[in-house]
Amino acid sequence: MEESDSEKTTEKENLGPRMDPPLGEPEGSLGWVLPNTAMKKKVLLMGKSGSGKTSMRSIIFANYIARDTRRLGATILDRIHSLQINSSLSTYSLVDSVGNTKTFDVEHSHVRFLGNLVLNLWDCGGQDTFMENYFTSQRDNIFRNVEVLIYVFDVESRELEKDMHYYQSCLEAILQNSPDAKIFCLVHKMDLVQEDQRDLIFKEREEDLRRLSRPLECSCFRTSIWDETLYKAWSSIVYQLIPNVQQLEMNLRNFAEIIEADEVLLFERATFLVISHYQCKEQRDAHRFEKISNIIKQFKLSCSKLAASFQSMEVRNSNFAAFIDIFTSNTYVMVVMSDPSIPSAATLINIRNARKHFEKLERVDGPKQCLLMR
């Protein structure tokens, strides 16, 4: 869609869309913008065209299930919105010093996490023309004030050398403009690799990426839209962006000890990413949190198709009891008890009593206090 010059200028200066209006407010209500108290974190999502960026983003933020991503296209912009998410596609045309017109493509999304924390997600188009412009005419604009760079690699790419070249160009721009940014590399589409080869291929790719990233450090994840690995990676990324996460974890531990729970997890309400957890002993399945995220997210989607909303769930047998319930305005909580003789009502009352305290902790500028109630 063609924009006027004034619209382009505004978009380039603001570098992001307005937030969705509250319920009851008409679309496009004047004055509904990001509040001044919001703590914005700029996140770059980059990678070559076809690497799978749009599919993974649509699953995490737009409530797609994996099989529906095959039909992604023009409908993606119709689906990638909720009470927390607003998205806009910006295509800029610039004229260089010799009169050539260049175009680049960035989709901006504002995703609200935990009260005042807002992720300003820049999904950068991966076509060669766009990539070259990011490193030349728009270098400072794209790579300035970045908190996190997420670079997605297609594990089966036939242009690995070019992929690595673009990644190194990103690192050079980050080092110059945002040297404190955290770097995440997602080796994506691992489901296409033979199962007995996955560990070896990922290890080799991880070693290459760590070597190329020096002097910066990068965290590498193997991912696929078909299993819990996608949630594992994005939970780890979001965890790095939560400003008071240590305070949150300390209070979560106190809460678990007070109610004698084996495990307590906090899920972000819209995405169901794990943002914090406490466990009193090691468990056999290291990926169980992400598996739960995936299962509950799909169950929530099934509920929405029936015009119902997911609020809580209880699973109980002779060995344990597990509760998933709305916790704060931005989170769900999961409590696992190894003593199934404890009445459900007692656990649910404890969850309810802790809500107000954790609501305060979610505020970026909230009080730094500890849970001491009994």
Curated annotation (Swiss-Prot):
InterPro entries named among the record's database cross-references: Gtr1_RagA (IPR006762), P-loop_NTPase (IPR027417), RagA/B (IPR039397)
Q: Which reaction does it catalyse?
A: GTP + H2O = GDP + phosphate + H(+)
According to the UniProt record, one GO cellular component term is: lysosomal membrane
- Give the main EC class: hydrolase
Subunit structure, briefly? Interacts with RRAGC and RRAGD; heterodimerization stabilizes RRAG proteins. The GTP-bound form of RRAGB (in complex with the GDP-bound form of RRAGC or RRAGD) interacts with RPTOR, thereby promoting recruitment of mTORC1 to the lysosomes. Component of the lysosomal folliculin complex (LFC), composed of FLCN, FNIP1 (or FNIP2), RagA/RRAGA or RagB/RRAGB GDP-bound, RagC/RRAGC or RagD/RRAGD GTP-bound, and Ragulator.
Family in the record: Belongs to the GTR/RAG GTP-binding protein family.
Gene transcribed to yield this protein = RRAGB
Changing residue 127 to L has the effect of: Maintains GTP-bound state. Increased RPTOR-binding
Bridged cysteine pairs (disulfide): none
Which residue stretches does the UniProt record annotate as biased composition, category Basic and acidic residues?
1-15
Does the keyword GTP-binding feature in the UniProt annotation?
A: yes
Keywords linked to the UniProt accession: Acetylation, Cytoplasm, GTP-binding, Hydrolase, Isopeptide bond, Lysosome, Membrane, Nucleotide-binding, Ubl conjugation
Record the organism. Homo sapiens
Function, as annotated: Guanine nucleotide-binding protein that plays a crucial role in the cellular response to amino acid availability through regulation of the mTORC1 signaling cascade. Forms heterodimeric Rag complexes with RagC/RRAGC or RagD/RRAGD and cycles between an inactive GDP-bound and an active GTP-bound form: RagB/RRAGB is in its active form when GTP-bound RagB/RRAGB forms a complex with GDP-bound RagC/RRAGC (or RagD/RRAGD) and in an inactive form when GDP-bound RagB/RRAGB heterodimerizes with GTP-bound RagC/RRAGC (or RagD/RRAGD).
Its organism's taxonomic lineage begins at: Eukaryota, Metazoa, Chordata, Craniata, Vertebrata
Question: What influences the activity of this protein, per its activity regulation comment?
Answer: The activation of GTP-binding proteins is generally mediated by a guanine exchange factor (GEF), while inactivation through hydrolysis of bound GTP is catalyzed by a GTPase activating protein (GAP). The Ragulator complex functions as a GEF and promotes the active GTP-bound form. The GATOR1 complex functions as a GAP and stimulates RRAGB GTPase activity to turn it into its inactive GDP-bound form, preventing mTORC1 recruitment and activation.
Region Disordered, annotated ranges: 1-29
Instruction: Please give the name of this protein.
Output: Ras-related GTP-binding protein B
Q: Which Gene3D superfamilies match?
A: 3.30.450.190, P-loop containing nucleotide triphosphate hydrolases
| A GO BP annotation | regulation of TOR signaling
Residues bearing N-acetylmethionine are 1
Q: What is its EC number?
A: 3.6.5.-
Annotated residues for binding of GDP: 50-55, 69, 75, 188, 191, 209, 225
